[in-house]
Design a protein with these regions (language model features):
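PLP-dependent class I/II
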Residues: 1, 6-147
Length: 147
C-alpha cells in the first residue's frame, strides 16, 4: 500500500515568509481580503433578502462568519434547474450539490455560492440573476406538481 506523500515546496514557504513577515503581516493581509470580500457577501445576502424573502418560503441561506461560500437552499428538486437556468444566461455557479459526496444532493436543493472572485458590480448583477432563476425554477416546479 502506498501512502500519500505531502511535501511543501520550500521556495513557496520562503516567498510567504518574505511577503507576510510575521503574525501582524498575516493579519494585515487578511484585513485586505476582508475589505474586498465583505461587500460581495453582503451584496448576495441583500439580494436574497430583498428578492427572495418576499416570495415566501422558496429559499433560505446561511450567514457565514468566514469562509468562501454562502449555502443557498432552494425548494427540493430545484437546485439543478436553477443552475441550468443560470448557465443559459451566462452565469456559472458551483455545481448543484457540489457540497455533497459525489455531488449527489438527495434533495436537489443546495447551491454553494462563491462571491469571492468577481467584482462587486458583477456579484450584484449575478445575485439578481440568481434570484430570478430561483423564482422561475420554483414556479416551474409548482406548476408541474399541479399538472
Amino acid at each position: 500500500m502506498t501512502g500519500v506523500q505531502t511535501c511543501a515546496l520550500p521556495i513557496y514557504q520562503l516567498r510567504h515568509v518574505r511577503f507576510l513577515k510575521n503574525k501582524e503581516g498575516v493579519l494585515a493581509h487578511m484585513a485586505k481580503h476582508r475589505r474586498r470580500l465583505v461587500p460581495c457577501f453582503d451584496a448576495v445576502k441583500t439580494a436574497f433578502t430583498e428578492k427572495l424573502t418576499p416570495c415566501g418560503n422558496i429559499a433560505h441561506w446561511t450567514n457565514p462568519k468566514g469562509g468562501y461560500f454562502i449555502s443557498l437552499y432552494v425548494m427540493p428538486g430545484c437546485a439543478k434547474r436553477v443552475a441550468a437556468l443560470c448557465k443559459e444566461c451566462g452565469l456559472t455557479l458551483t455545481g448543484a450539490g457540489s457540497a455533497y459526496p459525489y455531488h449527489k444532493d438527495p434533495e436537489d436543493s443546495h447551491l454553494r455560492i462563491a462571491p469571492t472572485y468577481p467584482s462587486l458590480d458583477e456579484v450584484e448583477t449575478a445575485s439578481d440573476l440568481l434570484c430570478v432563476c430561483v423564482k422561475l425554477a420554483t414556479v416551474e416546479k409548482l406548476l408541474a406538481e399541479k399538472a
